[in-house]
């Protein structure tokens, strides 16, 4: 096919990610209790323009661009959207005669619908709450006048955009044979719908468009009248249809009613097509109509005679086009949704000093893949691979990335080393406590991967270490599923399906394999690892194998004095509630919390773990609920446990989101789920905490999101306590925090006359005051004094707070 690549001179515009809120806080700060998404915004699937903005849809959220200022705003559940799975967007211009402002229409995979303006979101749940059985997902949105036509998995839903209500539902093939609709087109006085089984039309003046009797199928469609139609467009009086899915179909055309023919140059075996567009959607009537065809990795432009328009600059094929639209206000600008370049602005006829080409997207990770997290203050690193329930690798090779000092970075490969993007299934990650820029990853295929200052510096396998290949069946692989640094900088890790399943890389770089005798064979799997402060190494044995606890006796370089034991549901082996183990964590009191398939279990004392009397057993917390006694979260599979600065337990589950437990575990202080919070999915894979600022990172099956928590690390000296926000103005409605405190400090807030208006206790180094007087009213205008004293009464500190509201 004769292709002309629209190329762009890519002068990348470095854009800081922006919030959709108009907050008055200093840059980099945000109130306690607020959320922030860490979604990939570079992979844009759809674009629509209108008003002063251009909107782009990703797999998890939406973002807007102001073309004049280049300001980018993110819109996810954090900013008030209903869900985290948008599938279609379209701009509605509004109706000035009836004083209706324009807004963005957002459709979701389950049929939910948001009508979104900067001022808020109006949710229309009629489809998702309907009794329709089957796929309710919204495929695309067509707007005509004051109505939106939603192409859904069962038919077309007509929305009155002035009344915010469903006006009609078109069942193209009847309510007994629901038909998936891919797009809706209006041509002259005829409605045309593309479906999963051909093309149907009906006159616009038909009184019963909800009836199948109103619709006629195009029986002359090429290939088959029941072909899957992924796209359809009118170009003048010509019709173009793409038969087959987006990845491999054929583009056909009918010239002014003539017989169908394969589009000139289109491969007979089919190829990718992701968008068909014309410039007739602009508010400015163009001099000549132009057709755009968005292929896999290029864009073609044709005039009305189907002549390729002469080459105009360059668009690199690496962008991977997914959607196209002419700017509604400027027909000289084409907006291109791409998987790698974000939202691309292409100027068809650039002039000096005018609008430039550009690439736009908010900051974020390259992808939403995540299995494990590790965080050390302002350093968060993500292992992006995975295995299925039988521990077969997912063959995910998307590299690794980290959030360092607030910026997402990708690990790069040094010259002469293997390309890190080709390494599959990173399962685990650990940050060196002696050097937070030094990170070690475990791969299910390649062994240990060492990263320093954002660069991959080494791969450790049988060629240069004690790490060996394991018997994974037909293909030998070097599988490392667990890594954890101890406080001395020694890296403990597991080596699956080998005779050396537990190993350590000492801080000096020496590798040592632990001698476990005949406890393991090359047929045994071995998973995650956690080193506790007493030096014990706790190892997860996957798929119902329980736990291995290893005691290196304080000498990891000497194996002759070591000991180990296995824990299981057996009374003589720790009495775990389940042999299915997913997470191990140590709290601030030295208690070991185990995430099992039957809720959390706790080892309150581990000093006698290796005594012969076998008295160390796991406990479960008995609570009373609805008048009945039961074990805490006993029906949940606990996939993650992490401890915050206040010794609270953040518990992730396989299907119920995140529970926040009190220090003793007896009280559920909070429960975050996709139903009551911005968490994108209830399947929690891992949790990590930045103890420096209290930010809790939650890894879900649909990406990472964070919550600014109420607890941080503490400072026994309390030399630099500070209040946020300060001053508190009329716009602030949330809590007021005091940071830099000692553990469990008592904080008194007094007015200028010395009257106590609030007393709070810190969680770790942070105290949170609701800003209310004793009668529940907001503290009034004035200067307040903050007095803090540690729990022993030995150290104190003070500061001031101004309230200006």
Question: What is the meaning of each model-derived region?
Answer:
Residues 29-50, 76-95, 124-144, 168-187, ...:
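Short coil-to-beta transitions that initiate beta-strands within beta-rich domains
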Residues 747-757, 784, 793:
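Short, glycine-anchored, charge-dense loop/turn motifs used at functional sites
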Residues 53-56, 103-106, 147-150, 191-193, ...:
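Conserved beta-propeller blade signature
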Residues 715-748, 766-769:
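Glycine-centered coil/turn sites that cap beta-strands in beta-rich domains
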Residues 756-779, 791-794:
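Glycine-centered tight-turn motifs at strand-turn-strand junctions
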């Amino acid at each position: 096919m004769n292709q002309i690549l629209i190329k762009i001179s890519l002068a990348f515009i470095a854009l800081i990610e922006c919030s959709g809120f108009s907050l008055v806080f200093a840059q980099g700060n945000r109130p306690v209790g607020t959320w922030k998404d860490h979604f990939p915004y570079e992979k844009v699937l759809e674009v629509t323009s209108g008003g002063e903005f251009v909107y782009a849809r990703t797999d998890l959220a939406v973002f807007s661009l102001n073309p004049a200022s280049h300001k980018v705003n993110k819109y996810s559940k954090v900013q008030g959207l209903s869900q985290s799975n948008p599938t279609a967007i379209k701009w509605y211009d509004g109706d000035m005669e009836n004083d209706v402002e324009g807004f963005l229409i957002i459709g979701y995979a389950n049929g939910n619908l948001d009508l979104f303006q900067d001022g808020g979101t109006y949710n229309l749940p009629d489809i998702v709450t309907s009794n329709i059985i089957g796929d309710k997902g919204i495929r695309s949105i067509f707007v005509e006048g004051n109505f939106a036509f939603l192409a859904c998995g069962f038919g077309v839903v007509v929305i009155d955009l002035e009344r915010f209500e469903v006006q009609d539902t078109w069942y193209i093939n009847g309510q007994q044979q629901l038909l998936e609709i891919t797009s809706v087109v209006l041509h002259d006085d005829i409605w045309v719908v593309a479906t999963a089984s051909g093309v149907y039309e009906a006159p616009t003046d038909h009184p019963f468009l909800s009836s199948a009797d109103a619709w006629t199928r195009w029986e002359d469609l090429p290939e088959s009248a029941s072909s899957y139609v992924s796209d359809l467009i009118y170009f003048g009086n010509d019709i173009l249809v793409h038969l087959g899915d987006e990845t491999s179909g054929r583009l056909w055309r009918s010239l002014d009613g003539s017989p169908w023919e394969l589009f000139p140059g289109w491969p007979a075996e089919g190829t990718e097509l992701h968008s068909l567009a014309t410039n007739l959607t602009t508010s400015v009537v163009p001099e000549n109509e132009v057709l755009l065809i968005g292929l896999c990795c290029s864009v073609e432009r044709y005039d009305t005679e189907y002549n390729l328009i002469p080459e105009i600059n360059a668009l690199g094929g690496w962008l991977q086009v997914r959607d196209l639209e002419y700017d509604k206000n400027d027909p000289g600008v084409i907006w291109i949704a791409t998987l790698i370049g974000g939202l691309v602005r292409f100027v068809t006829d650039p002039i000096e000093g005018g609008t430039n080409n550009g690439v736009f997207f908010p900051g974020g990770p390259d992808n939403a893949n995540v299995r494990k997290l590790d965080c050390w203050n302002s350093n968060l690193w993500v292992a992006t691979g995975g295995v299925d329930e039988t521990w077969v690798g997912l063959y995910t090779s998307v590299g690794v990335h980290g959030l360092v000092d607030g910026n997402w970075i990708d690990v790069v490969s040094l010259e002469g080393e293997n390309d890190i993007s080709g390494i599959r299934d990173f399962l685990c990650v650990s940050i060196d406590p002696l050097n937070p820029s030094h990170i070690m990853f475990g791969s299910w295929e390649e062994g240990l991967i060492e990263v320093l200052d954002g660069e991959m510096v080494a791969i450790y396998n049988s060629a240069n270490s004690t790490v060996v290949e394991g018997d994974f069946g037909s293909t030998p692989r070097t599988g490392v599923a667990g890594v954890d640094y101890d406080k001395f900088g020694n890296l403990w890790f597991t080596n699956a399906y080998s005779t050396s399943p537990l190993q350590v890389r000492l801080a000096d770089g020496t590798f040592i394999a632990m001698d476990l005798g005949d406890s393991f064979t090359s047929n045994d799997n071995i998973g995650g690892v956690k080193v506790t402060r007493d030096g014990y190494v706790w190892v997860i044995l996957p798929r119902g194998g329980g736990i291995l606890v290893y005691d290196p006796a304080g000498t990891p370089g000497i194996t002759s004095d070591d000991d180990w034991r296995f824990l299981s549901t057996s009374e003589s082996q720790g009495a775990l509630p389940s042999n299915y183990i997913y997470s191990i964590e140590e709290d601030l009191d030295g208690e070991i919390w185990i995430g099992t398939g039957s809720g959390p279990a706790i080892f309150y004392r581990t000093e006698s773990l290796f005594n012969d009397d076998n008295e160390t057993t796991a406990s479960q917390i008995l609570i009373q609920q609805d008048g009945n006694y039961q074990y805490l979260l006993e029906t949940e599979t606990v996939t993650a446990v992490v401890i915050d600065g206040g010794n609270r337990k953040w518990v992730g589950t396989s299907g119920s989101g995140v529970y926040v437990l009190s220090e003793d575990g007896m009280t559920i202080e909070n429960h975050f789920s996709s139903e009551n919070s911005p968490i994108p999915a209830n399947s929690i894979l891992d949790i990590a905490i930045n103890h420096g600022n209290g930010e809790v990172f939650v890894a879900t099956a649909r990406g990472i999101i964070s919550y600014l928590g109420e607890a941080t690390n503490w400072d026994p000296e309390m030399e630099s306590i500070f209040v946020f926000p300060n001053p508190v103005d009329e716009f602030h409605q949330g809590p007021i925090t005091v940071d830099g405190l000692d553990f469990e400090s008592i904080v008194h807030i007094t007015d200028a006359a010395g009257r106590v208006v609030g007393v709070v206790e810190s969680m770790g180094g942070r105290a949170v005051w609701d800003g209310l007087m004793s009668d529940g009213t907001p503290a009034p205008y004035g200067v307040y004094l903050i007095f803090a004293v540690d729990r022993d009464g030995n150290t104190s500190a003070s500061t001031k707070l101004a309230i200006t509201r």
